[in-house]
């Protein structure tokens, strides 16, 4: 599935950056963003339901379609957050952990929800880590969001989550197009780096801050621990790389040349 990027939505529909972050990159739904109830209904009727109820079922054998939808909804709601498969099983109250894992794989292959693994030098630890779920388009997240666009803008904590999820959505799509792995990092002290891009042994560290970059200990801890492999690192936000510049980055070039 192809999603429109920031500059395309801006040029075609006059989207502001804030509108792109919240409503995502579905050109067919752009005319409805000023009527959010209608926009959400259109998201469900013209995007989500056709994909889950028809497109995926045409190409995959899904024994429990309601569970597939529940996993998708959880992935959307928890976009840019960690959640264990065991916890997901408890929330949906059905299915097995292997089934949920297989449905996440299908949602990843169809560019809906990506389960990010935690970066580790050990491939086994990476594979067995608690995933950080990432919607491929922030429109999925906000189809289920309890905050309207204006409410999200006014809520500092919520808007921070919106921005992080939008950045992750862009990176998830570029990972497929540009051929790199998208991961995250957290250590036993709960130091965290929001996104880690990996190509071969080369790493790029990205931290997302929608406001003041005042809590970036995890970002620095990651760079210190994996200094030999990091070829680029930067903060996305008002005190780092502006969102307008981030969304037009040539990411493959960052594995070759420092952004600094």
Q: What is each PLM-predicted segment?
A:
Residues 3-16:
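Conserved small helical "lid"/interfacial subdomain of P-loop NTPases
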Residues 13-49:
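Amphipathic alpha-helical "lid/sensor" segments that cap RecA-like P-loop NTPase cores
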Residues 36-202:
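Accessory nucleic acid-recognition modules appended to NTPase machines
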Residues 174-177, 222-231:
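Arginine/glycine-rich "motif VI" loop of SF2 helicases in the C-terminal RecA-like domain
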Residues 202-213:
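Active-site ExK catalytic segment of metal-dependent nucleases
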Residues 212-221:
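Active-site-adjacent loop/helix micro-motif of nuclease/hydrolase catalytic cores
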Residues 238-260:
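Domain-level recognition of nuclease-like catalytic cores that cleave nucleotide substrates
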